[in-house]
């Protein structure tokens, strides 16, 4: 995140959330955060890249009501719904990992034991008294073991992205660890993104092979693309359009285009509905920045009032809830607060 409210560049968010509506661009860049727990999915992807896609992804489901007592980092949010199969058992779907990754967002607020207790409560809130409750707890403990194993890797599993051999070894190692601890859950948790990582790595190997001419590289890349499943190929085409739209929005912002001019340009390439959503996002973004600045000023007054840490945190949490009333806003503000605290 960047300064001034810590927001991601509007160009990217406008496309991801407003214009094209895709999962964010996947690729080998995901390796830069390998092995981290907090703030990312377990694969080390950025938050906006951890959206499920591919055959292992479960369709979106409504969230369940938030627990009565949520950690500060999750205040105002609701846990994703745990999916069940026709027999009432926990469904082997990516949505289960999404639920656990949601819970892991709170690990900066909780001890290891506290995090386990929180996950148990969140599972019970949905599955209390069912066979799926014990199944979900078992998968949680296995997932924690997987994360702990990743954390024990050298440099937490991070590798030099320019070293394709190291990338290949890291991918194989992470897949092995996932299967060792998660067994048949490793496929719904990581199968789609592991496939994508291997595909992207194969593309890099071709592109960087000094023994190939440009024509040979193009031929091999085209052949590799033909091996891609139809749904992945369609997703890649959408990603390509997303990249082009991101570049266009960034150029318009850089040139100082007015909102009306930007909307007119985007209408030509993205269509009127998408252009209208980008314009609305600009307005929402400006409103957010004003409200966050006002909130930050009030938060600073609380921080300088000489309160005990417990009273200070309680007053700041209450302030967040008063100022940020829309779903997810309080969570976003808390995340920005933590980032600001780390920078100080």
Curated annotation (Swiss-Prot):
Region entry Disordered, spans: 37-78
- Per the UniProt record, which residue ranges are transmembrane? 14-34
Q: Which terms in the GO cellular component ontology are assigned? A: plasma membrane
Q: Which Pfam families match?
A: Lipase_chap (PF03280)
Task: Output the InterPro entries linked to this UniProt entry.
Answer: Lipase_chaperone
SUPFAM superfamilies in alphabetical order: Lipase chaperone-like (SSF158855)
Membrane topology term = Single-pass membrane protein
Determine if Cell membrane is one of this entry's keywords: yes
Whether Ribosomal protein counts among this entry's keywords is no
User: Which keywords does this chain's UniProt record carry?
Assistant: Cell inner membrane, Cell membrane, Chaperone, Lipid degradation, Lipid metabolism, Membrane, Transmembrane, Transmembrane helix
The GO biological-process annotations, alphabetized, read as:
lipid catabolic process; protein folding
> Where, per UniProt, does this protein localize?
Cell inner membrane
Which spans does this entry mark as compositional bias, Low complexity?
43-78
Provide the GO MF annotations for this entry: unfolded protein binding
Tell me where it mainly resides.
membrane
Q: Where is the signal peptide?
A: none
> What is the stated purpose of this protein?
May be involved in the folding of the extracellular lipase during its passage through the periplasm.
| UniProt record similarity statement | Belongs to the lipase chaperone family.
Q: What NCBIfam families does this protein's entry cite? A: PRK01294.1-1
The entry's protein name is: Lipase chaperone
Q: Which organism is it from?
A: Burkholderia cepacia (Pseudomonas cepacia)
Q: Which gene encodes it?
A: lifO
């Amino acid at each position: 995140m960047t300064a001034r409210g810590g927001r991601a560049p509007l160009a990217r968010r406008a496309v991801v959330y407003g214009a094209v509506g895709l999962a964010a661009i996947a690729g080998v860049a995901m390796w830069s955060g390998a092995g981290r727990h907090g703030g990312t999915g377990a694969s080390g992807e950025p938050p906006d890249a951890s959206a499920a896609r591919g055959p292992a992804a479960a369709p979106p489901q409504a969230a369940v009501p938030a627990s009565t007592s949520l950690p500060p980092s999750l205040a105002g949010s609701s846990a994703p719904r745990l999916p069940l199969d026709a027999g009432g058992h926990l469904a082997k779907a990516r949505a289960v990992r999404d639920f656990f990754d949601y819970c892991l967002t709170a690990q900066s607020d909780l001890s290891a034991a506290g995090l386990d207790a929180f996950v148990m409560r969140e599972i019970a809130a949905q599955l209390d008294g069912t066979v799926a409750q014990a199944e979900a707890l078992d998968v949680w403990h296995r997932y924690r073991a997987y994360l702990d194993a990743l954390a024990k890797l050298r440099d937490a599993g991070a590798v030099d992205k320019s070293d394709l051999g190291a990338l290949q070894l890291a991918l194989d190692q992470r897949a092995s660890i996932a299967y060792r601890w998660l067994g048949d859950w490793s496929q719904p948790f990581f199968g789609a993104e592991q496939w994508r990582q291997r595909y992207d790595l194969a593309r890099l190997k071709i592109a960087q092979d000094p023994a190939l001419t440009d024509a040979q590289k193009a031929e091999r890349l085209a052949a590799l693309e033909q091996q891609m499943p139809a749904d992945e190929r369609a997703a890649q085409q959408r990603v390509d359009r997303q990249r082009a739209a991101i570049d266009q929005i960034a150029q318009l912002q850089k040139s100082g285009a007015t909102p009306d001019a930007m909307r007119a340009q985007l209408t030509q390439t993205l269509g009127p509905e998408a252009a209208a959503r980008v314009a609305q996002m600009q307005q929402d973004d400006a409103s957010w920045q004003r409200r966050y600045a006002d909130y930050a000023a009030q938060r600073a007054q609380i921080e300088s009032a000489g309160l005990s840490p417990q009273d200070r945190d309680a007053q700041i949490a209450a302030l967040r809830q008063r100022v940020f009333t829309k779903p997810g806003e309080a969570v976003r503000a808390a995340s920005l607060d933590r980032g600001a605290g780390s920078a100080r």
